Design a protein with these regions (language model features):
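Walker B beta-strand of ABC/ABC-like P-loop ATPase nucleotide-binding domains
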Residues: 177
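Active-site-proximal or metal-binding-adjacent scaffold patches in catalytic folds
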Residues: 1-20, 24-174, 184-228
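Walker B catalytic acidic pair
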Residues: 180
Length: 228
C-alpha cells in the first residue's frame, strides 16, 4: 500500500492480486488518527477528463437511450427545460452570447444535471432489470459526472455509473451494467469475474468481446468532450 497526495487530499492505494478476498477489514493510521479502509473493485476506465463541450444551438445528443437538443425560441425571456424519459429539449432565448466562459460553464452544468436525471429515469430501471435477471442485489445506486471510469462497485455493495454512459450504444451500456453487477460477486478482474459477467449476460465469451469494443469506443470518445 502507498499514499499519494492529489490537490492536498490523500488517498490510500491498495493493490491486490487477481482472486484476492473481496472483504477486507483494515485500519490506516495517518497523523495519529485511525482511518477505516474501504476496498473497492477495479473500475472500467474511461481515460478522459470530465466531458465538457462547446455548447451552441447546434449541440445535440442522439443515441438509442437519449435524444437531447437545444432550441432557440423567439420571445422567450429565460431558459426552459422540457424533459421526458429519453427526450430532453433545452429551450433558450435567441441571441445569447455562447462565447462567454460563464455561459458555457452554466450550459455544461445544465447538460450534466439533466444527464443525471435521465440516468435515474432510463438507466436505473435497466440496472434493476439486469440485477434481477442475474440474481444479484446491491445496496445503493448512484450516477456521477466522473472522468476516469464508466462505472464502479464497492465492497459495501454500492454501484456507481458515469452519467455519460448515455452516450454509448445499448449493448455497451448493458455490458457496463453487467460488469459492475459482476463485481458484487468478484471484486477483481479474474477469469471467474469474466465468467460471472457472461453468466449475467447469458452469452459465453460476451464479456471479453464487449470489453474490447468498449475500449475502442472510449478511445474514440477521447477526441470529444475536451472543451474548456
Amino acid at each position: 500500500m502507498f499514499l499519494r497526495e492529489v490537490a492536498r487530499r490523500f488517498s490510500l492505494i491498495a493493490r491486490f492480486p487477481a482472486g484476492a478476498a473481496r472483504k477486507w477489514h483494515a485500519v490506516c493510521c495517518i497523523g495519529g488518527k485511525k482511518l477505516p479502509l474501504l476496498f473497492r473493485a477495479p473500475a472500467i476506465h474511461l481515460k478522459l477528463r470530465k466531458m465538457r463541450f462547446k455548447i451552441t444551438p447546434d449541440f445535440s445528443i442522439s443515441t438509442a437511450l437519449l435524444q437531447f437538443h437545444i432550441e432557440e425560441v423567439p420571445g422567450l425571456s429565460e431558459a426552459q427545460l422540457r424533459s421526458a424519459p429519453g427526450a430532453v429539449s433545452l429551450r433558450l432565448p435567441p441571441g445569447l452570447n455562447y462565447g462567454l466562459r460563464e455561459r458555457q460553464e452554466w450550459l455544461n452544468r445544465c447538460v450534466v444535471e439533466e444527464l443525471r436525471r435521465q440516468c435515474r429515469l432510463v438507466l436505473a430501471p435497466r440496472v434493476q432489470a439486469w440485477a434481477k435477471r442475474g440474481g444479484v442485489s446491491f445496496n445503493r445506486l448512484t450516477f456521477k459526472d466522473v472522468s476516469s471510469r464508466w462505472g464502479s462497485c464497492s465492497s459495501l455493495r454500492n454501484v456507481n455509473f458515469n452519467v455519460w454512459l448515455l452516450l454509448l450504444d445499448e449493448p455497451l451500456v448493458d455490458y457496463v451494467v453487467c460488469h459492475e453487477l459482476a463485481h458484487l460477486t468478484h471484486l477483481n478482474h479474474s477469469a471467474h469475474f469474466y465468467a460471472e459477467v457472461d453468466r449475467i449476460m447469458g452469452i459465453l465469451g460476451e464479456a471479453v468481446r464487449r470489453d474490447r469494443e468498449l475500449n475502442r469506443v472510449s478511445r474514440s470518445l477521447a477526441a470529444l468532450g475536451r472543451y474548456r
